[in-house]
């Protein structure tokens, strides 16, 4: 990604308004997730663990983030689309929205107006309130697509960005057929809530706590427990220093599960042009 996204930065706008439909949507999912213990089964718990990894590590971390947002490696188009579909099923937004917002975050990290989830506005803002008080320039398609023109010109990504929410319906029906209500509650509601917070911790906790290996221009930090629940994304100081690298864990103790999957794809000949080291002479990204 070499485009100068700062040149199309959104204007510093007015105070955002609370969007109740977002509050109700996330509130209902959290309430239903709390009912999960009444539908417990060991198979449902196993499904939860598997889907948290599949949608979190493969769909979001590997797909939406390292592949689509930063282009740190390449895969065949059919595989790219399949991984993006898995990312859409994570219910964290369509690919154009997610990638566009993340690129805005990197272009204007911690700017209180231009970073969609600036940590300078506090833990809860960067964690979830940025969704409850949405700024049009971050949630309007015609605006955020400017940050992801490579995706916006592809019909598949436009379709996925529009209909990602509806994909949960056939997915939930499939889970019901396979395992009844326990699979629905653990595979949809509880899985969504846990994965949402796992991802949000990268925006909030990893900009507040942890250690800094590199003297980057922002407050991103390396936080071990966030890396556990996000499969390697918690090594955030490393990532903000070298955002186009396919791996975030740079030392042996910085476990990066998503990087293992990329290495497997590379071994199978499916991942090409993998960026596994900083650009020569680079100090930060």
Swiss-Prot record:
Localisation per UniProt entry: Membrane
Cofactor(s) needed by this chain: Fe(2+)
Gene Ontology terms describing biological process: fatty acid biosynthetic process
Signal sequence coordinates: none
Renumbered ranges of motif Histidine box-2: 102-106
Motif, Histidine box-1: chain positions: 65-70
One Pfam family this sequence matches: FA_desaturase
Class of the enzyme per the UniProt entry, highest EC level: oxidoreductase
InterPro entries assigned: Acyl-CoA_DS, FA_desaturase_dom
GO terms for cellular component: membrane
Catalytic activity line of the entry: a 1-acyl-2-hexadecanoyl-glycerolipid + 2 reduced [2Fe-2S]-[ferredoxin] + O2 + 2 H(+) = a 1-acyl-2-[(9Z)-hexadecenoyl]-glycerolipid + 2 oxidized [2Fe-2S]-[ferredoxin] + 2 H2O
EC number: 1.14.19.27
Disulphide-bonded residues: none
Record pathway: Lipid metabolism; fatty acid biosynthesis
Keywords: Fatty acid biosynthesis, Fatty acid metabolism, Iron, Lipid biosynthesis, Lipid metabolism, Membrane, Oxidoreductase, Transmembrane, Transmembrane helix
Organism superkingdom: Bacteria
Annotated TM spans: 20-40, 44-64, 81-101, 169-189
Motif (Histidine box-3) on chain: 239-243
Induction comment from the UniProt entry of this chain: Constitutively expressed at low temperature.
Family membership: Belongs to the fatty acid desaturase type 2 family.
Purpose: Desaturase involved in fatty acid biosynthesis. Introduces a double bond at carbon 9 of palmitoyl groups (16:0) attached to the sn-2 position of the glycerol moiety of membrane glycerolipids.
Domain notes: The histidine box domains are involved in binding the catalytic metal ions.
Protein name (record): sn-2 palmitoyl-lipid 9-desaturase
Organism: Nostoc sp. (strain 36)
Lineage of source species: Bacteria, Bacillati, Cyanobacteriota, Cyanophyceae, Nostocales
Gene name of this polypeptide: desC2
């Amino acid at each position: 990604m070499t485009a100068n996204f700062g040149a199309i930065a959104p204007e510093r706008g007015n105070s955002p308004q609370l969007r109740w439909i977002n509050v109700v949507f996330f509130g209902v999912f959290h309430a239903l997730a709390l009912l999960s213990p009444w539908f417990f089964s060991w198979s449902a718990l196993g499904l939860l663990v598997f889907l948290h990894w599949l949608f979190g590590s493969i769909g979001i971390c590997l797909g939406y983030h390292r592949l689509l947002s930063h282009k740190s490696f390449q895969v065949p188009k059919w595989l790219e689309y399949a991984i993006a579909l898995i990312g859409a099923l994570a219910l964290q937004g369509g690919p154009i929205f997610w990638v566009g917002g993340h690129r805005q975050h990197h272009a204007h990290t911690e700017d209180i107006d231009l970073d969609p989830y600036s940590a300078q506005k506090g833990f809860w803002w960067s964690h979830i309130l940025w969704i409850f008080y949405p700024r049009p320039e971050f949630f309007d398609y015609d605006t955020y697509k400017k940050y992801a023109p490579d995706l916006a010109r592809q019909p598949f990504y436009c379709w996925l960005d529009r209909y990602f929410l509806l994909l949960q319906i056939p997915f939930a029906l499939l889970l019901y057929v396979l395992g009844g209500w326990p699979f629905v509650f653990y595979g949809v509601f509880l899985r969504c809530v846990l994965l949402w917070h796992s991802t949000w911790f990268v925006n909030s906790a990893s900009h507040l706590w942890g250690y800094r290996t590199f003297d980057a221009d922002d407050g991103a930090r390396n936080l071990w427990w966030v890396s556990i629940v996000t499969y390697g994304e918690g090594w955030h100081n490393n990532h903000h220093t070298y955002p186009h690298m396919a791996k975030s864990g740079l030392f042996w103790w910085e476990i990066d599960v998503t990087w293992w999957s990329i290495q497997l794809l590379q071994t199978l000949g499916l991942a090409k042009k993998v960026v596994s080291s900083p650009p020569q002479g680079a100090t930060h990204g």
